[in-house]
A protein has these predicted regions:
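Short helix-boundary/capping micro-motifs
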Residues: 10-28
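A short LG(V/I)-centered, amphipathic sequence patch enriched
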Residues: 40-59
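Alpha-helical linker/hinge and terminal dimerization helices associated
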Residues: 42-43, 66-87
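Central regulatory/effector-binding core of bacterial HTH transcription factors
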Residues: 89-151, 220-221
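Hydrophobic hinge/microswitch elements
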Residues: 126-130, 135-139, 145, 199-254
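Beta-alpha-beta core module
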Residues: 152-158, 163, 225-274
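Flexible hinge/capping segments at coil-to-helix
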Residues: 154-191
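Secondary-structure junction motif
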Residues: 189-211, 275-279, 293, 297-298
């Protein structure tokens, strides 16, 4: 079975037009038609309902089955190509949220040999985006955060820190007179928040749902520095993990919610990934360095 034929077929199931698929791949329309016929001959089934050529392409029942399997085959093919390319060069493409990049990685950098840094290609992105990139093969490794429990069985995860979430306010804010807060009491407050690809937003939604409140988010960003600056300028308050280091002028108020989510951080990679000896050594060194630190001492 030809990978290119499967690529043509999957594209046809999405675009539902032979001419559009041909244009997408810069080939002739007969090339696409021939690829579909080869698949039908090999699989001994009809994949398309051939009715009015002016109507969008429709799939038979087996055509839908083949579409599902073809998507999986192409994903595995992409993973294979990316894994082989990275293993051959002994490089590690690592996804890392800005909070981890700023608040965790610098504290272990001195434990790592200088040569290691030339073998790491860091990608800055939120934890949810990093997890997706890991599963798609765009990343070899991720140092990511998750809430409560991690249940994805396709990912090997080694957790090295767990932190609580708190409310961050300016030191001169009226809320700063409290020693602790319940999230429900903040229902009329304005919040500034990290965007949806961060687990902080998941935590915000979880607490809102548990307390049956919908606080207003007046500003959102991918940059933790922007969030802290907005809080300092009294634009809004923020829900942040205790892993975030606060600059002068800001104060952390613990939450009293019994079922408040926890911010957990770990090193993750795909179970199916086979690393070169050099890559495996890099991962072992990174993981050991993260585990050697008492993160609650900071």
């Amino acid at each position: 079975m030809n990978i290119k034929d499967l690529q043509y077929y999957v594209s046809l199931t999405q675009l539902k037009n032979f001419s559009l698929v041909a244009a997408q791949f810069h080939v002739s329309q007969p090339t696409i038609s021939a690829a579909i016929r080869r698949l039908e001959t090999e699989l001994k089934t009809q994949l398309l309902i051939r009715a009015n050529p002016h109507l969008p392409v429709a799939l038979t029942t087996t055509g839908i089955q083949v579409q599902r399997h073809a998507n999986q085959i192409l994903l595995e093919h992409q993973l294979m190509c990316q894994e082989v390319a990275h293993t051959t060069t002994d490089q590690l493409v690592i996804g890392m949220p800005p909070i981890i990049e700023i608040n965790y990685f610098p504290r272990i950098a001195s434990q790592l040999p200088q040569a290691l840094f030339s073998q790491i290609q860091p990608i800055s992105q939120g934890s949810l985006a990093a997890l997706k990139g890991l599963k798609k093969g765009q990343l070899d490794l991720a140092v990511l955060a998750y809430l409560n429990e991690f249940t994805d069985t396709t990912i090997q995860l080694t957790t090295f820190d767990t932190q609580s979430f708190s409310i961050v306010v300016p030191t001169d804010d009226p809320l700063a007179t409290n020693s602790q807060l319940q999230f429900r009491s903040l229902r009329h407050q304005h919040f500034v928040a990290l965007k949806d690809n961060f687990v902080h937003r998941q935590a915000f939604r979880q607490l809102s749902h548990q307390n049956h409140v919908r606080p207003t988010i007046v500003f959102e960003s991918n940059e933790i520095g922007s969030i802290l600056n907005m809080v300092r300028q009294h634009v809004g308050i923020a829900l942040l993990s205790n892993a975030v280091q606060l600059p002068a002028g800001l104060q952390r108020l613990p939450l009293t919610d019994a079922q408040a989510p926890t911010f957990n951080v770990g090193v993750a990679y795909r179970h199916s990934m086979t690393f070169s000896p050099t890559q495996a050594d890099l991962i072992q060194r990174l993981t050991a360095a993260f585990q050697s630190v008492d993160w609650h001492a900071y």
